[in-house]
Amino acid sequence: MTKKVGLLVMAYGTPYKDEDIERYYTDIRHGHKPSEEMIADLRGRYHAIGGLSPLAKITEAQAYGLEKALNDSQDEVEFKAYIGLKHIEPFIEDAVEAMHKDGIEEAISIVLAPHYSSFSVEAYNKRAKEAADKLGGPRINAINDWYKQPKFIQMWADRINETAKQIPADELLDTVLIVSAHSLPEKIKQHNDPYPNQLQETADFIFEKVVVPHYALGWQSEGKTGEPWLGPDVQDLTRELYGREKYKHFIYTPVGFVAEHLEVLYDNDYECKVVTDEVGAAYHRPPMPNSDPEFLEVLRTVVWEKYSN
């Protein structure tokens, strides 16, 4: 009989329907109910991208697509995917409990975010481990980051180069690549959190493989907590770069994300485009990985390497 291994795929989660918005937002705010104004603001942003975020369907397609890719590529073990979300059901704890009930003794966990941070990935891993400890299993081997995977870097480079083909050859010199990820509170730097450096490394690796001659690092989608967050924000960065260099084309590459969701469809496609329109430059963004076969191959390689080692 083929050995069964759990595949715990963890992600942020998103409201499934309009009625979920309040409890979802309350969970993000550690149980503090948001004001009517905050809910209206979030509703407005979802409305601007054409309704609720497609993230739930994409996460599902990524998890089960990864399960299939792993099982199709070898017959040593059978992987079974379980989705665990941070802010809405099925919660991380629900997924661990389902694995335990199914008699899974060993699992590999991966967070659908390439960079490690104590604030994000570590928090997911901690919840999974605590849930497993409480139940007496399964044993979870956590993948902390996977931004260095050569197939991941190549995937983004290919997408950027494809996008650059839309730019007239004589304007390529006036083009800049903006590489970004979700901002986090600046206090993470006090604890030598590797997150900012990992984004820098990702940008450097990608830049070596693209035809675009300039790049800059930015942060986006910061929370409204009143404390300082990592910067520069991508919108401020766009204005600053245009003011200094008069770039004609901006290619936004939110490599910290793996799907087309609110932070990309609104914070990039709407908010950043407002700025490029304002300064008279062109806005470009390569397609997100979503559940594309080349991205599933990235994840498959990462999980299989973890399992094999």
Curated annotation (Swiss-Prot):
CDD domains: Ferrochelatase_C, Ferrochelatase_N. The gene is cpfC. This is Coproporphyrin III ferrochelatase. Belongs to the ferrochelatase family. One of its GO terms (biological process) is heme biosynthetic process. InterPro entries: Ferrochelatase, Ferrochelatase_AS, Ferrochelatase_C, Ferrochelatase_N. PROSITE patterns: FERROCHELATASE. One of its GO terms (molecular function) is ferrochelatase activity. It holds the Pfam family Ferrochelatase. Pathway: Porphyrin-containing compound metabolism; protoheme biosynthesis. GO terms for cellular component: cytoplasm. It catalyses: Fe-coproporphyrin III + 2 H(+) = coproporphyrin III + Fe(2+). Involved in coproporphyrin-dependent heme b biosynthesis. Catalyzes the insertion of ferrous iron into coproporphyrin III to form Fe-coproporphyrin III. SUPFAM superfamilies: Chelatase.
